[in-house]
């Protein structure tokens, strides 16, 4: 997908953009259905477990976060009663048929847990160990559903215009990443 200023301005304004029919002609429900079908396809894999988040409290996220990790504890460690899970975060944009992925870790304990957020610098990085097959499977399924998988080369670039983006994830001057993947509490 070619990233134009028109597309960036639309997604910053909260409007759908892109050539995929769900985004070009569809309503919010069609876009949600498209993302749901994509996640369902990912969930069918025997190689990964998927946990999804599409909101964070009372805020708004311009993307759905899918955390993918190996089943049966194969990407987990337990230290001092806390479970640490290595995986791949996949962000599916709700405003354009674009997605990103990169290394993510989560922790869980009896008192709660923690996780982070991807930034433009984290893209196309993967956890240590054997993840190539899983990465390839995720990529294939995302591309089958019409998502363009963007990387740091495209998304680390600054916006070519001044924009106001309500986000807790970045500060001005904003990057192309911030236009597609923003969250505000």
Residue locations for each model-derived region?
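Extended, charge-biased low-complexity segments
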Residues: 2-144, 149
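Acidic, proline/glycine-rich low-complexity IDRs
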Residues: 137-185
């Amino acid at each position: 997908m070619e990233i134009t200023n028109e597309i960036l301005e639309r997604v910053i304004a909260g409007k759908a953009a892109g050539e995929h029919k769900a985004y070009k002609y569809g309503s919010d429900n069609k876009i949600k259905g498209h993302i749901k079908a994509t996640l369902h396809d990912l969930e069918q894999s025997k190689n990964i477990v998927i946990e999804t988040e599409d909101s964070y409290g009372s805020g708004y996220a311009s993307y759905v976060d899918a955390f993918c990790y190996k089943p049966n504890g194969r990407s987990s460690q337990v230290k001092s009663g806390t479970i640490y899970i290595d995986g791949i975060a996949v962000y599916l944009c709700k405003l354009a048929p674009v997605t990103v992925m990169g290394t993510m870790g989560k922790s869980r304990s009896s008192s709660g847990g923690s996780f982070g957020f991807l930034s433009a610098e984290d893209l196309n990085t993967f956890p240590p160990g054997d993840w190539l097959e899983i990465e390839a499977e995720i990529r294939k399924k995302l591309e089958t559903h019409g998502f363009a998988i963007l990387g740091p080369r495209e998304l680390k670039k600054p916006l070519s215009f001044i924009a106001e983006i309500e986000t807790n994830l970045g500060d001005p001057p904003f990057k192309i990443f911030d236009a597609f993947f923003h969250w505000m509490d």
